[in-house]
Regions:
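Gly/Ser/Thr-rich active-site loops/lids in small-molecule metabolic enzymes
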Residues: 97-115, 178-197, 231-237, 267, ...
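A glycine- and small/hydrophobic-rich beta-loop-beta segment
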Residues: 124-125, 133-197, 201
Length: 284
């Protein structure tokens, strides 16, 4: 009789869970609006190993938060988020990359998904667990990220470019490991695909584009120039010299710049910053 959202987390022996009757009953519950939290695999109470294990508490909480804790003001909005670094190979052993961990982009993807958006997370190599309630698209290089973004361009309402994409890659990739020699070594570099420039040049009026900038000086001036040059609607500016901001930390200090004004945010968690970004998108 309850009218509130209802979640079910089945936990049982693998044979019971995989029984067709159980599976039919779970489908019936979903048909009537129940959210079924997938069981995990592992050691069960009966000492068997298999599916049917109750998910960890943090996983259950994630599902509960997704169901009841946030307004679904982004429901139906198709959002693509890029996150993390790219890797540009030099040889089979080495590559050029940067210090990005992907934490900011992942936080944005999670915030948007929690508010009902249809989120695609396009990301480079990270040590982070997948973001639930999103479509996961792993890539490695700038070229792969370019292809992932452009191939989904027409099916996107909001594009949030939080990835730290390499500007240059080795002009040639050695087939074998480059051996150490006496003296210096020079590496010829070439430009990678400028994803934001392509997006700005092909941007339809309906598409909302948010970029990120990392600066060490003239934060507002340089970021505003990038906003205009790349034809973006919003840019999130980071000053890497501010304590608690930038790569590898769980906090950030950002300035959100749009054509309507500038909003400076104090030091806070990256989840908090992501919430402000989601607010800006919901209110656009």
């Amino acid at each position: 009789a309850a009218k509130c959202p209802k979640l079910v987390s089945p936990a049982m022996n693998t044979g019971m869970l995989e029984n067709p009757i159980t599976q039919d009953n779970l489908k019936t519950l979903e048909h009537y609006g129940f959210a079924v939290i997938p069981s995990e695999s592992g050691l069960l109470a009966c000492k068997d190993v298999g599916s049917g294990r109750l998910p960890r508490e943090d996983v259950l909480i994630e599902y509960i938060l997704h169901t009841i804790a946030r307004p679904k003001d982004l429901a139906g909005v198709r959002i693509a988020v890029t996150a993390g670094p790219t890797q540009e190979p030099l040889d089979p052993v080495r590559y050029l990359t940067n210090h990005s961990t992907g934490k900011m982009g992942y936080a944005v993807a999670r915030a948007a998904a929690m508010r009902g958006a249809d989120v695609t997370l396009i990301h480079g190599e990270t040590a982070l667990p997948p973001v639930k309630f999103t479509t996961d698209v792993p890539v490695t290089s700038a070229r792969q990220m370019y292809e992932a973004v452009t191939s989904r361009f027409d099916a996107t309402d909001v594009l949030i470019m939080a990835a730290a994409v390499a500007d240059y890659r080795p002009a040639t990739v050695a087939a074998d490991k480059v051996k150490k020699h006496d003296g210096e070594m020079s590496i010829a570099l070439e430009r990678t695909e400028d994803i934001l420039a392509w997006v700005g040049a092909h941007k339809p009026e309906k598409l909302f584009v948010c970029g990120f900038s990392m600066e060490t000086r003239d934060l507002i001036e340089n970021s505003t120039a990038k906003l205009k040059k790349k034809n973006m609607d919003m840019i999130v500016a980071n000053n890497l010299k501010v304590p608690g901001a930038g790569f590898g930390v769980d906090t950030n200090v950002v300035t959100i710049i749009t054509g309507q004004g500038i909003t400076e945010l104090p030091l806070q968690s990256k989840d908090g910053v992501a919430g402000h970004i989601a607010d800006a998108i919901a209110n656009k």
